[in-house]
From Swiss-Prot:
HAMAP family given in the database record: NAPRTase (MF_00570)
Name of the protein in question: Nicotinate phosphoribosyltransferase
GO cellular component: cytosol
A biological process from GO: NAD biosynthetic process via the salvage pathway
Chain positions found as Phosphohistidine: 242
Pfam family membership, one: NAPRTase
Length: 434
């Protein structure tokens, strides 16, 4: 693939629309895995997704032009999966398994298009909402976030000249390569790209993926971005997300169903997938509550992804639970993915080395680390914590607690109800940067 001069491309403003989303495969792999499950098992469920900017000091609607945002969202709505993409999805092996996507699902997917959106402004923030069938609205999460983040990057760089942009990207590349050199010191460490949703830009994420592929070789295990995995002959990686237990809990008709919701979606998942895809995400309503009530069969799954507790603390908690359940942690897998950068990755790897298998999903600090790279300080290049979460399912409010109270989402009254029901044991409040 020919190399792109990113700085020159950013400076060139001659086109009417420079699309941010160029393909429906420009999404995280777990969205497709979850989509197949939703399409098969929850075809009649409605789900609303809402944009949430947790960095309240950044007024997105003041930084991003509303018409540019609408143009990018409209462009994404016009995309379809191409014939080449459908052939690749049907014929490629994922996690060692052929035909992971059912033929009838692929027939439906070939006709898929993103549903309508609702966009307004309030108090300097965008209110961006997607309503409809869960099997349609779920696919907006990643492109919506990628569009918001790249438009913010573009706005921050709009007034920069070509040489300033050259310096900006040269410094960002040098910073990234220093991280690669740190990772080389640990050849048994396994790391993948999880950086799509809050990336600086598509072209920059592509550069980072290509740099990791060359720089750390077999230690780089793949990308969550399906398009980049396809184009770079990499493994598409990813398992499942919080939206599954969030929707299941919102649909619960009584306390018994609410308590069972986190485990019901795992049983649903197990109907479709197995092996290395049996990864538990335990923190939707708090890891302590999940482990306290987890059935014995959960301990037979391949591994866990602790996503909101400090990585060493979260990993130790899960290892202790495996031992309590009579399982050997050395045969299990921990996937760390919450706000990681190289120093945290290396520290966590060295702490657990030899005690458990590990993999690291490197996200925003891989694909959007531009703070201080411009010749003058540009706040718009600093990453923010923006998410797109399920807010309703069949008209019922959806909630996420997490192990970090600052990452909780949902109606405040419902959040309080969930806290009373599941408890808040071992919650650790931490600042949320990304």
């Amino acid at each position: 693939m020919p190399k792109t001069d990113i700085a020159r491309r950013v400076y060139n403003h001659t086109w009417k629309l420079d699309p941010i989303i160029r393909s429906l495969l420009d999404t995280d792999f777990y969205k497709l895995l979850m989509l197949q499950m939703i399409w098969q098992l929850y075809p009649d469920v409605d789900a609303t997704f809402s944009l949430i900017n947790r960095t309240k000091t950044v007024r997105l609607a003041d930084e991003i032009d509303e018409q540019e945002l609408r143009d990018q969202l409209d462009h994404a709505r016009g995309l379809r999966f191409t014939k080449k993409e459908m052939i690749w999805l049907a014929g490629n092996s994922f996690y060692g398994r052929k035909q992971i996507f059912a033929p009838e699902f692929l027939v439906w997917l070939a006709k898929f298009r993103l549903p309508p959106y609702e966009l307004s402004r309030r108090d300097g923030q965008f209110e961006l909402t997607f309503r409809g069938r869960w099997a349609e609205t779920t696919m907006w999460e990643i492109p919506a976030l990628a569009i918001i983040n790249e438009l913010r990057s573009r706005a921050a760089m709009k007034g920069l000249g070509p040489f300033t942009l050259d310096v900006l990207y040269a410094r960002a590349k040098a910073r990234m390569w220093l991280k690669v050199e740190q990772l080389r010191e640990h050849p048994n460490l396994r790391i993948s790209d999880f950086g799509t949703r809050r990336r600086h830009s598509f072209l920059w994420q592509r550069w980072c993926v290509e740099a990791l592929k060359e720089g750390i070789g077999p230690s780089f295990t793949g990308s969550s971005n399906v398009l980049l995995a396809m184009d770079n002959d990499l493994e598409a990686v990813g398992t499942n997300a919080h939206e599954l237990p969030m929707v299941a809990a919102a649909l619960a008709r009584n306390d018994r169903e609410l308590a069972a919701a986190p485990y019901k979606v795992l049983q649903d998942w197990n109907q479709l997938y197995g092996g290395n895809l049996l990864i538990v995400l335990p923190d939707a309503f708090g890891t302590a509550a999940f482990l306290r009530d987890a059935p014995d069969w959960v301990a037979d799954w391949t591994g866990f992804r602790p996503d909101s507790a400090p990585p060493i603390e979260g990993g130790e908690k899960i290892i202790a639970w495996w031992k309590k359940m009579g399982r050997d942690p050395r045969e299990k897998l921990l996937i760390f993915s919450d706000g990681l950068d190289v120093d945290t990755i290396v520290k966590t790897y060295c702490h657990f080395e030899g005690r458990v298998r590990m993999s690291f999903g490197w996200g925003t600090n891989l694909t959007n680390d531009f703070a201080g790279c411009a010749p003058t300080e540009i706040n718009g290049l600093n990453p923010i914590s923006v998410v797109c979460k399920v807010s309703e399912a069949n008209g019922h409010p959806a909630v996420k607690l997490s192990d970090n109270p600052r990452k909780a989402t949902g109606d405040p009254g419902e959040v309080e109800r969930y806290l009373r029901f599941f408890g808040s044991e071992d919650f650790v409040e931490q600042s949320v940067r990304v």
